[in-house]
Each structure stands twice: as structure tokens, then as C-alpha cells.
């Protein structure tokens, strides 16, 4: 039996659509959308972010963790 491939839904970068030039580490509500329930950073192939904004999100999350605004682990 032949299986048909499903077309992948093309995800667009939400941060590009919002026209953000800078991802602020103090915006924990936005940053928490890019974390799993255990506190790990979601990869860009799942979020649909472009490379530029994924790097900004990564750096902002790491800064927020260091400042104590976001937890390293969620238990």
C-alpha cells in the first residue's frame, strides 16, 4: 500500500510579523511561549522562527534565566 506524503505547513516567524527589532529579556510573557513545560527552549523548526529571531530569543531567555526572571527548570 502506498502512503501519501503530507505537505508540511509552512510556519512563519511571528516576530517578523510583529516587526520586532529586539527581543527584550524582561518580556517574560513572550519568552515563555518559546519554552517547553519543562523549561527547555523550543527549536526553530517547531516554532517557525527565522534564524535571526531564534538567536535573539535564545540570548534573551539565557539572560532572563541569569537574572532570575525565568526558571532554569520547571518541575
From Swiss-Prot:
Q: Does the keyword Calcium apply?
A: no
* A GO term for molecular function: structural constituent of ribosome
The residues that cross the membrane are none
- Tell me which HAMAP family the record gives: Ribosomal_bS18 (MF_00270)
Q: What does this protein do?
A: Binds as a heterodimer with protein bS6 to the central domain of the 16S rRNA, where it helps stabilize the platform of the 30S subunit.
User: Subunit structure, briefly?
Assistant: Part of the 30S ribosomal subunit. Forms a tight heterodimer with protein bS6.
Q: What is this protein called?
A: Small ribosomal subunit protein bS18
Q: Which organism is it from?
A: Thermotoga maritima (strain ATCC 43589 / DSM 3109 / JCM 10099 / NBRC 100826 / MSB8)
Amino acid at each position: 500500500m502506498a502512503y501519501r506524503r503530507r505537505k508540511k505547513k509552512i510556519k512563519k516567524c511571528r516576530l517578523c510579523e510583529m516587526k520586532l527589532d529586539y527581543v527584550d529579556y524582561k518580556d517574560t510573557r513572550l519568552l515563555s511561549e518559546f519554552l517547553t513545560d519543562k523549561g527547555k527552549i523550543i527549536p526553530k523548526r517547531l516554532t517557525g522562527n527565522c534564524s535571526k529571531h531564534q538567536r535573539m530569543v535564545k540570548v534573551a531567555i539565557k539572560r532572563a534565566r541569569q537574572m532570575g526572571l525565568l526558571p532554569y527548570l520547571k518541575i
